[in-house]
């Protein structure tokens, strides 16, 4: 089976790498077709080939308007060039297609799969939602990461249920094999000694950081610290005016080595998201499972399906009271943390393993090829 996994903008290198490596272990001939990752180093190929075909002339800092403009200029020529490359594949598996109204006309004439990392475009307008719906209709199969995601695709976006397959997002266990390293310098050289709760990932309004800080304000756990680590995509100044005690910030993109150090040190990982209408899972949650970390999750999207494994505490979204209570319980009870950690490791080795995801993905490919 010759498979091309395609992520034009290199939005999710960890996911791309883990999927390609797992498909290769399962016997597929895999090529990752993407672009250079603008924020730092990406995982090295492991059993698959790498082809950085897209946006080779992109200029400007990562995330800048200049870089976006140069990528848009290259988009149509690169998608057309990719169509000639795709003739060597039995199946083409897109991870992202972000110019929805245009990309459906540029798909290669091969069996195509699209993973719905974002069920809807970010901050969607009506025209974007319509374009996303048409794009889903143009591919042969759509992958959701949870039953919740499947329901959203079918009920809200009108995708044919026969073309939607639920395949769990694998746990990022490759990150656990990174050598022991130093924490980000912003966290200080001295270990705080007390328990640490970690909030990790791009800082966006829907992730509930304001609710988390309010919950932390009333937490009575002595010596506990909250580490907020990730690149801001929102204004942080209003949140930093009255910070509660014990909060440390790393407001930037961190390396994989720093990421691994943060997760190893944390006792609890917290995802207090206020909404997941546009997506159904989280790479941060996949990382927490891989490291065997107990999690506190808002009851949104597909998070409840992970909590059902026993790996997480589930709390109502946008409510600091229950969030505070769950954090206090876990930070203060090592025995309970061990219980949830064991369930997290079992989930990462079982239903949320990349080998399980690869098996199900290959089954889908074979159905499409016939």
Regions from the language model: what does each represent?
Residues 237-260, 268:
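Nucleotide-activated donor-binding/catalytic signature segment of Leloir-type glycosyltransferases, i.e.
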Residues 6-17, 21-74, 100-102, 149, ...:
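N-terminal strand-loop element at the rim of the active site
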Residues 329, 336-351, 360:
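A short, well-ordered alpha-helix in the C-terminal region of glycosyltransferases
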Residues 137-178:
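Donor nucleotide-sugar binding/catalytic pocket of nucleotide-sugar-dependent glycosyltransferases
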Residues 309, 313-321, 329-335:
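Conserved acidic donor-binding segment of nucleotide-sugar-dependent glycosyltransferases
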Residues 12-14, 74-83, 91-109, 121, ...:
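An aromatic- and histidine-rich active-site surface loop
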Residues 189-207, 213-217, 226-227:
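Conserved donor-binding/catalytic core segment of Leloir-type glycosyltransferases
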Residues 263-279, 293:
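Acidic donor-binding loop of glycosyltransferase active sites
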